[in-house]
């Protein structure tokens, strides 16, 4: 999961088997977070875009974009955490977006060269979108 800020990220941790990774963490804490994820001590990584690039996280099957990525490049790197070689299942990427962000979603589709399928509208504020 990706959030725009460390404050949003920390506010959204819900279970014991969730860990977080963001730029405000000192490097030893980041290393411990990744070690816990790789060892299976935690199931879910809630992260800011600090985790979008350069991390080898095998076995990731689902990426949830809780906030719109700032660019198509960021989207591609976030989504690239799922469906990597060696994954048992194809990767799925969920993008949570408000209805008033439809133009932003369309722009993301064009720039990232992806088709985003609208699945369901939830209330007045959120939309779940699947890509992949």
What are these model-derived regions, one by one?
Residues 1-132:
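Conserved helicase RecA-like core
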């Amino acid at each position: 999961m990706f959030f725009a800020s460390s404050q949003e990220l920390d506010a959204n941790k819900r279970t014991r088997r969730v860990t977080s990774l963001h730029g405000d963490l000192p490097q030893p804490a980041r290393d411990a977070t990744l070690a816990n994820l790789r060892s299976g001590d935690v199931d879910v990584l809630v992260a800011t875009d600090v985790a979008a690039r350069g991390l080898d996280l095998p076995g990731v099957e689902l990426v949830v974009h809780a906030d719109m990525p700032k660019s198509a490049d960021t989207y591609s790197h976030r989504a690239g955490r799922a469906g990597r070689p060696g994954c048992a299942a194809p990767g799925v990427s969920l993008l949570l977006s408000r209805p008033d962000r439809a133009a932003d979603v369309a722009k993301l589709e064009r720039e990232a060269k992806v088709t985003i399928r609208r699945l369901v509208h939830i209330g007045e504020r959120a939309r779940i979108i699947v890509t992949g």
